[in-house]
Design a protein with these regions (language model features):
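N-terminal pre-domains immediately preceding structured catalytic cores
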Residues: 1-377
């Protein structure tokens, strides 16, 4: 590497120094920008630093709770976390795996879902295991699934007091492209894969999981996502820009999207339309990502797959659409009875076979055909 140029001599002290005088700039009319050399010697870059680095990513899920986070009275249970999830980017050089940077991130948890006209609790997990990043998407868009509550996609209409105006408008910032969208400024898409006998990677479908930016900064250190691995927006831009600077890629341009959804809320219908996606940078060599299982906490060792009704403050319990009530016991729902205002009890029981009605069947989420925009956030 070429040796740095000798540092320029520092300027002589000036009494009553005025920076505008020294640079011959009129503070009232500065005119075109001026440049001034500064005495700075850039540190020598490490040997492994080049234009096409052998990069890998590891996402540690940290402490993971699968248990339902509310008790029989609808009060939040304590689920302490000592190890927060984090993302680490590595490079491998001469057989040594070198960590380059580590950032806080999120994993999935219990979130609200709109199922059969009712808002439920549903565990939205972050699957562990190997995946790959095949593309980086700038200014991505989020296509909300039918399970997204309509109110989450609406904003108060500032003109709602005017005649003929609806009380809400579609929140276009939530879908994007926008710094405040569900996917933030940039996203990397997670794909499952299989390695063939000759070492090639066979890339499979998009599971809807992303590593992406987010404007909800406090969620990254304290709360859960819908399954995606959120990063602070500025961190996501730094990370993905580094990947593109050190991984050969090609520009595929803007995604074409034809997405629409009609939403009913408080007797009004609102139409959401998305006609264009983000700008795609396709990586010539996918980046391998290992999502670690983390440390499972509590008594439930696997994700609860069925939805759980929201706590009904009036009835005083978790009430199913058919009027039956249930309690959450570990990874199961058990029937219970709720007292009536007159002190009696309602016959709130599950079906005779004791089964919990399947509520996911009507809202299947695509896996192999999810496309590059996915369903989670």
């Amino acid at each position: 590497m070429k040796a740095p140029s000798p540092l320029p001599s520092p300027p002589k002290p000036v009494v009553d120094f005025n920076p505008f005088d020294e640079l011959n700039i009129d503070p009232e009319s500065p005119g075109p920008r001026s440049t001034v050399p500064l005495p700075f010697a850039r540190p020598t870059l490490p040997e492994y630093y080049d234009g096409d680095m052998d990069l890998t990513v590891e996402i540690d899920r940290g402490d993971v709770w699968y248990e339902f986070p509310y008790d029989d009275l609808g009060q939040e249970r304590a689920q302490p976390v000592e190890r927060r999830p984090h993302t680490t980017i590595f490079t491998t050089y001469e057989g040594q795996r070198i960590p380059l940077a580590r950032f806080g991130t999120t994993i999935g948890g219990w979130r609200s879902e709109f199922i059969e006209g009712q808002v439920w609790w549903k565990y939205k997990g972050s699957p562990h295991g190997p995946v790959v990043w095949t593309e980086i998407v700038a200014a991505p868009v989020w296509l909300p699934p039918e399970t997204t509550p309509p109110r989450d996609l609406l904003d108060r209409n500032p003109l709602r007091r005017n005649a003929g105006e609806k009380p809400f408008v579609v929140d276009v910032h939530e879908t994007g492209p926008s710094y405040a969208s569900a996917y933030g400024l940039v996203a990397a898409y997670h794909h499952t894969y299989r390695e063939t006998n000759d070492g090639a990677l066979r890339i499979y479908g998009d599971e809807g999981i992303r590593s992406h930016g987010s404007v909800d900064y406090m969620s990254i250190m304290r709360r859960h996502s819908h399954g995606c691995h959120r990063l602070h927006n500025h961190i996501a831009v730094r990370l993905m820009s580094f990947v593109l600077a050190h991984r050969h890629h090609r520009r595929e341009g803007m995604q074409r999207v034809n997405f629409s959804r009609d939403m009913e809320h408080e007797g009004e219908t609102y139409r959401l339309e998305v006609n264009e996606g983000g700008y795609v940078f396709a990586l010539e060599r996918p980046i391998r990502v290992e999502v670690l299982e983390g440390r499972i906490r509590g008594s439930v060792g696997a994700p609860i797959t069925f939805p759980i009704p929201k706590y009904d403050e009036v009835r005083g319990g978790y009430v199913l659409p058919d009027g039956g009530a249930v309690l959450v016991r570990g990874s199961e729902l058990v029937p219970t009875t709720l007292a009536t205002p007159d002190g009696g009890a309602l016959d709130d029981t599950l079906p005779s076979d004791g089964a919990v009605p399947s509520l996911d069947g009507g809202v299947p989420m695509p896996v192999d055909d999810a496309g590059p925009w996915g369903t989670t956030r």
